[in-house]
């Protein structure tokens, strides 16, 4: 049976709507009928066919890894799921046999493969994943929100790596993940949450999500913002979401002694760092990759159930046949999360 899918068909700029064979599930898998998908920054990299994509993405391949759908098939060894369950899923497929997997630290699996990156993705009418990777969506959480659980998980993992209650938090990079991390920080009790970027559209979006200050670093100095807020010692926690070297070095400059930094943004490999700031301030830096399985997922659901409102981050919806408009919108930088509807 042929189904619709968005695929990387050629080693050049673009994504194409095509037909592929419906995937077949194994004994330990679920077959999921996709309802909605969201476009990730990674999908934009794949669309643009940048240096990372050229090294990483097999062609041809169905892409995409942010989704919500309904279980329509269950492998014979699978327990705990029923036909009709609403699910999203962890996009990192882990090996199960390395030391970290066996020690319960599956997000650190050295043999991880990615849905829509190294194996068939979710931009399709149907997806097969290991049942281990599926996460049931509680009633009361909308399909729209469920479809962005993957990037929301990046935000939650990054933000909740350190205690935020009563702390002053600096977030560099107001992409959708940075903005969601800011909303999480405010929701769990941070005092001042300051986010920086140069994109006014996204800074306005951050204001709608409740940040203390959204700072365009082209027009305003962080030192002046800290002074306005009555901060005399620097930020307690930093969340680096941009991969921008000057943003990271500005963060180091403005951290308090003993401050803690989560790094999610991917910088150039030759980024220059003022390590004296790290050493003499006694800073702690933690690299963040993906989501903790599945502690982050439970936290995500609980945060929404306890009143965290992420709806402003979803700014655009398109039918799957209009996927090109969705990618154009994401590439323009004038959007939050963009949802593609498969129904």
Swiss-Prot record:
**Where on this chain does NAD(+) bind?**
177, 197, 202, 264-266, 288-289
Q: Does the keyword Transport apply?
A: no
Q: Which UniProt keywords apply?
A: Cytoplasm, Metal-binding, NAD, Oxidoreductase, Zinc
The note on cofactor binding and number reads: Binds 2 Zn(2+) ions per subunit.
Could you tell me the superkingdom of the organism this chain comes from?
A: Bacteria
What does it catalyze? L-threonine + NAD(+) = (2S)-2-amino-3-oxobutanoate + NADH + H(+)
Q: Where does this protein chiefly localize?
A: cytoplasm
GO terms (molecular function) for this protein are:
L-threonine 3-dehydrogenase activity; zinc ion binding
Query: What pathway does the UniProt record associate with this protein?
Result: Amino-acid degradation; L-threonine degradation via oxydo-reductase pathway; glycine from L-threonine: step 1/2
Described purpose of this protein according to its UniProt entry: Catalyzes the NAD(+)-dependent oxidation of L-threonine to 2-amino-3-ketobutyrate.
**Family, similarity comment:** Belongs to the zinc-containing alcohol dehydrogenase family.
What do we know about how this protein assembles, alone or with others? Homotetramer.
Protein name, per record: L-threonine 3-dehydrogenase
